[in-house]
Every structure is written in structure tokens, then in C-alpha cells.
Amino acid sequence: MQVDLLSSAQSAHTLHLFHQHSPLVHCMTNDVVQTFTANTLLALGASPAMVIETEEASQFAAIASALLINVGTLTQPRAQAMRAAVEQAKSSQTPWTLDPVAVGALDYRRRFCLELLSHKPTAIRGNASEIMALAGVANGGRGVDTTDAAANAIPAAQTLARETGAIVVVTGEVDYVTDGHRIVGIHGGDPLMTKVVGTGCALSAVVAACCALPGDMLENVASACHWMKQAGERAVARSEGPGSFVPHFLDALWQLTQEVQA
């Protein structure tokens, strides 16, 4: 199994494209992470919108550059709105990304996420336990936390990518991105990133935005992982703990965009 590495030049090129296109991202995400997700997208130069009412969600999915479906705080009314948005995204050819939060631990969201797979997501982003559960390999995870190493989920990610046509991202100490055939590994980041709620969910929003860019989608999505890990490393170097990490992280994302424009 060959795992390729993403070049810094490719990551920088994708970030330049990201800033040029400034994707409008329709984030149907969980209640816990909305502010952090929006600020992450803004720091990178995208435009976030959190539209959840069923009638509006369908309408907005048609005009957005990309759609994110995150099931972290799933309810039946929210599921109805997400269905409507995904159906409209499919009709409008709007790329959409699925973040199957805790799909291995809870039955209702597992059934819902499996239903959404029939609508062919453009990308799927989860931790190892979530990806393995979605692929039908195992049911696991400790709530939203993984109990598996990312590398162990690569075969499941490849299977899921081939079955759905999606770019699949498995996040962990090393992130792995696959289209079912090629695999790209992204190293970096810091364990402190796991002590702040929302870094994974925010990454899913950036992945969604990258799916709206021209070029090689696998490399574009891998670039999203690279930016987040880069920013995490820079932020940790300036932080004293989780509380000071968040503002430094947002600053680091912003600085990355300034560097590629210089």
C-alpha cells in the first residue's frame, strides 16, 4: 500500500486558489462548533453560512459553492432539513461533504448517514472509528472520540471511497486522504488540537470548501488537512493551553493565507 505525501507547493497553490474563489459554504453543522467553524472558514478567506430551516436549507444549497452535513447534534427536524439540502445539492450539482460524527456509537445517526450515502457525497471526513463504522467494518468509537488508529482505517476508507465515489478523509495523528486508489498522508499537528472542541468539525467545513475548487480534488482535500495541521503547530508554539490555542489557531490560518499572496 503506497502512501504519497502532499508537497508544500501543492498545498500553497490550493490555498491561493481557495482565496481567489472564496467559496460560499453552507454549513449544516452541530450546535457546539458553529462559531469556531465559521471563524475557521473566514480566516482562510471563505464565506460561511449556517442555514438550517428546511425550506431555506434547500433553497440555499442551490446557490452555495459547497454544502457541509455534520450530524453531531442530530435531531429529526434537522435530519429533515439535511435531507432536503442534500437532495437539492445533488440536483444543483453542488458538492457536499458528510461528517458522520459518532456514527459508530449511535443507531439513529448511523441509519441516517447510511441513507445519505445513497446521494453520493463528494467527500466524507471522519476519525478512524467513524469511517470504519460507516464502511460496515466495525461499530465503535467512544462517543465522538475514536478508539482506532487512523492507519487501521485505510482499507475501510478505500472501500468507502470506491463504493460512493467520494474522497474519504481519515483524521488522526496522521491524516489519510483517498479516492479509493491513491492515498495521501498528511503529517503534523499537535495533540493539543484534540483538547479543543471543533477542530475536526471545522476541518470538515474546509474540506467541503475545497471540493468547490478547480483542479485535482484529492490534492485539494489533502491540502485542507495540511493547512489545519500547519496552523495547529504554529498555534501550539504560542499557546499555554486550550484556552489560548483557539485565537492563535485562527491567527495562524489567516497568516497562511497572507503568505501565499505575498
Swiss-Prot record:
Keywords: ATP-binding, Kinase, Magnesium, Metal-binding, Nucleotide-binding, Thiamine biosynthesis, Transferase. It comes from the Bacteria. GO terms for molecular function: ATP binding; hydroxyethylthiazole kinase activity; magnesium ion binding. Substrate binds at residues 50, 198. Its EC number is 2.7.1.50. SUPFAM superfamilies: Ribokinase-like. The keyword Signal does not apply. The keyword Ribonucleoprotein does not apply. ATP binds at residues 125, 171. It catalyses: 5-(2-hydroxyethyl)-4-methylthiazole + ATP = 4-methyl-5-(2-phosphooxyethyl)-thiazole + ADP + H(+). Pathway: Cofactor biosynthesis; thiamine diphosphate biosynthesis; 4-methyl-5-(2-phosphoethyl)-thiazole from 5-(2-hydroxyethyl)-4-methylthiazole: step 1/1. Signal peptide: none annotated. InterPro entries: Hyethyz_kinase (IPR000417), Ribokinase-like (IPR029056). GO terms for biological process: thiamine biosynthetic process; thiamine diphosphate biosynthetic process. Its cofactor is Mg(2+). Pfam families: HK (PF02110). Catalyzes the phosphorylation of the hydroxyl group of 4-methyl-5-beta-hydroxyethylthiazole (THZ). Belongs to the Thz kinase family. This is Hydroxyethylthiazole kinase.
